[in-house]
Amino acid sequence: MNILSRCLMALSRKSRMSIKDVTFSSEGALYTIVISSSTIEQMVSECLKAGVNETGGILIGSYSEDSSTAMIVEATTRPADSLAGRTTFQRGVRGLRPLLHARWKTGLYYVGEWHFHPGGSPEPSGDDFRSMTSIAANSDYQCLEPVMIILGGDPAGSYSLSASVSPRGDAPIRLREVLI
């Protein structure tokens, strides 16, 4: 085993030990998002593979009975037909339909999108918000309030997350991390 492999294994063990579930909420708790630690691990792993390029995928999860809380349990890898560069990411669709159909059978659904801003802030860009507004308006997604999670920074070191929800017909709403 070479040194790089040992370092990646050590980083992987460290990440699993230190990553916890993260909760974001809007003022008045109208919208709440809970991201599982395994979902964050999936995103960090994909970001490490992407290096200096943006990457992303879809978010899969379920909703509370009153639909006020999205519980995110999976972040997919980027579809093979995605386009990515240093400052751009356009998610493809290859393989998503059968994946979502399989998850739907287990009570899980498309809840939104995630992507990576390498070395940068997790703040959503105007393009990010326009994309989510378009998804909210598109009935094909069957998601009235899609979530957007952005991981920014260095996934091997210091990174942070942002969360937004885009209610159909309204402006996107930035959520704040709930510190427990």
From Swiss-Prot:
Traits of the deletion mutant: Essential for CBASS function; when the operon missing this gene is introduced in E.coli it no longer protects against phages T2, T4, T5 or T6.
EC annotation from Swiss-Prot or TrEMBL: 3.4.-.-
A GO biological-process term: defense response to virus
Binding site for Zn(2+): H115, H117, D128
Annotated InterPro entries: JAB_dom_prok, MPN
Source species, domain of life: Bacteria
Consequence when changing E54A: Does not cleave CdnD-GFP fusion protein. Increased conjugation of DncV to cellular proteins
Ranges for domain MPN: 33-165
Induction: Part of a CBASS operon consisting of cap4-cdnD-cap2-cap3.
Active site (record annotation): E54
Keywords: Antiviral defense, Hydrolase, Metal-binding, Metalloprotease, Protease, Zinc
GO MF term list: metal ion binding; metallopeptidase activity
Family as reported in the entry's similarity comment: Belongs to the peptidase M67B family. Cap3 isopeptidase subfamily.
Function comment: Metalloprotease priming reversal component of a CBASS antivirus system. CBASS (cyclic oligonucleotide-based antiphage signaling system) provides immunity against bacteriophages. The CD-NTase protein (CdnD) synthesizes cyclic nucleotides in response to infection; these serve as specific second messenger signals. The signals activate a diverse range of effectors, leading to bacterial cell death and thus abortive phage infection. A type II-C(AAG) CBASS system.
Official protein name in the record: CD-NTase/cGAS isopeptidase
Native organism: Enterobacter hormaechei subsp. hoffmannii (strain UCI 50)
Lineage: Bacteria, Pseudomonadati, Pseudomonadota, Gammaproteobacteria, Enterobacterales
UniProt gene name: cap3
